[in-house]
């Protein structure tokens, strides 16, 4: 489906729900994708990762440690999803939320992460982890250096497969104490 924003969809859903298990929101396209400081993130229908994962807060989490762990998990998942295309220095996270890949003579933005906290009264109850990755985009209109995985490494990874890999890894990694 098309949605304005998977994070907004998840946040709206959480107003009436309080899941005790992970819930994944994904779309073929979002029309009002957002990043830090209300910046827009553009995607092409069916060609990019557009997802938000809702997780109940775990006792061992703190907001700062969670953000760092999410970023490192996204980075390692991209490295694993594209074997042979990258080495350890090919993917980095520019704090707090930009995912960059090396191409040619520099780093280009390939995706972003937006972690939003949900509070019930004074209790931190859930997080919404929004992730966008340029997988097969051709129209990258951001005002900064952006690239897609397919343009950088002629990757044929499916956005749907990458969504599944990201969701599984995040659920596994964030469940473990860190």
Question: Across the structure, where does each feature detected by a protein language model lie?
Answer:
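N-terminal lobe of the biotin/lipoate ligase/transferase fold
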Residues: 1-83, 89-90, 105-107
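Long, positively charged amphipathic alpha-helical accessory segments at protein N-termini or as interdomain linkers
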Residues: 58-91, 101-178
């Amino acid at each position: 489906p098309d949605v304005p924003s998977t994070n907004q969809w998840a946040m709206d859903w959480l107003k009436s729900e309080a899941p005790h298990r992970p819930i994944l929101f994904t779309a073929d396209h979002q029309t009002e994708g957002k990043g830090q400081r209300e910046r827009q993130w553009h995607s092409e229908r069916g060609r990019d990762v557009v997802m938000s994962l809702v997780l109940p807060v775990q006792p061992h989490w703190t907001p700062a440690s969670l953000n760092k762990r999410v970023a490192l998990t996204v980075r390692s998942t991209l490295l694993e999803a594209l074997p042979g295309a990258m080495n350890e220095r090919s993917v980095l996270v520019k704090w707090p939320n930009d995912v960059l890949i090396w191409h040619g003579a520099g780093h280009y933005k390939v995706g972003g992460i937006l972690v939003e906290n949900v509070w019930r009264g004074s209790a931190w109850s859930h997080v919404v982890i929004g992730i966008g990755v340029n997988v097969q985009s051709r129209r990258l209109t951001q005002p900064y250096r952006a690239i897609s995985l397919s343009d950088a490494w002629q990757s044929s990874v499916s956005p749907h497969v990458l969504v599944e890999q990201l969701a599984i890894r995040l659920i596994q990694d964030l469940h473990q104490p860190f």
